Amino acid sequence: VSQKEKFIHALGQTNKEHFAMTCKDADVILVIGTLPSRNDAVLAQEIEACVDSGTKLIYLFTMEDPKLSSKSAFFSRYEVGSEEGVFALLAKSFLLHVKLPERLKTYFEELDEGYVSAESNIGEEEIEEIEAICSNATNILLVLGEDLMSHPCATQIANFAGLIANHASNVSLYVVGARQDDLRTATPNETMHEIDNIPSFDGVVVYQCPMVQDTEAQLLMGSPQFQMAARVQNNETINVTINQEVYRRTFVRDDSLKGVIALMPCDKASAVYPYHVAKIVKAEQ
């Protein structure tokens, strides 16, 4: 069973109609857990076209997407690794005025919002912004990215997303990379675990992402802020150590990037969560 199949199963959708294969019918698109300009150029174009014809875009990610951030009605950055917490907050917000089973109601009442907000960087203000944009929407599309499927807490993330679509009448799900025949109904799991240890990625972080051009396989691309944090020079040959493995790369400063996460293009997607705390040193010539 692939990661994607497991994730779709954990969404626990009671009705196939809750799945969407296109963004076209949505009046609000909420994208989370993907960098479309890198991971899915077709999706990025489709979202851009929707926004140009009046759809509102909410974009939540660990960094800005050069194509989508400027098109967003609201963009907010969450901390690497905190996706489960972000979904707990979104689910609580979306289901606030919905009649829920007692067990779920209690779960959301007891959710430690202070802790989750502090660790994820998505607080009350961000949730209020999202609520304001969604308040009059008749069709909200929740775009679930590949980061969510490879996350150690993928099952519970899918459970939260699934709860939203099963209980909120105006939300449908778009699973990035899924084909029509991947989308299946399943029994919902409505027993949630407490969120009490959101991981922290302290230090220099790299994001392994697909290559857009073949030449990128040798590069590590980062913003001016990343360059300062990692103490590297533009066009310098460096060794990037991730879990004891050393990758020789050339650092390239990219002024279109923001934040302190560098992009590490790879030729094939791996099934592990794509963020890594890395050690970066200048390579011996």
Residue ranges with predicted function:
Residues 15, 43, 126-127:
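Amphipathic coiled-coil/heptad-repeat helices and related helical stalk/stem segments
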Residues 51-138:
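Long, well-ordered, tryptophan-enriched scaffold segments
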Residues 12, 40, 123-124:
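A conditional alpha-helix N-cap/helix-loop micro-motif detector
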Residues 2-23:
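Glycine-rich oxoanion-binding loops at beta->alpha junctions
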Residues 138-145:
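A structured phosphate/pyrophosphate-recognition subdomain
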Residues 18-31, 35-71, 143, 150-285:
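A cross-kingdom feature strongest in bacterial/archaeal respiratory oxidoreductases
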Residues 3-6, 29-34, 114-115:
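Short, basic, glycine/proline-bearing loop/turn elements
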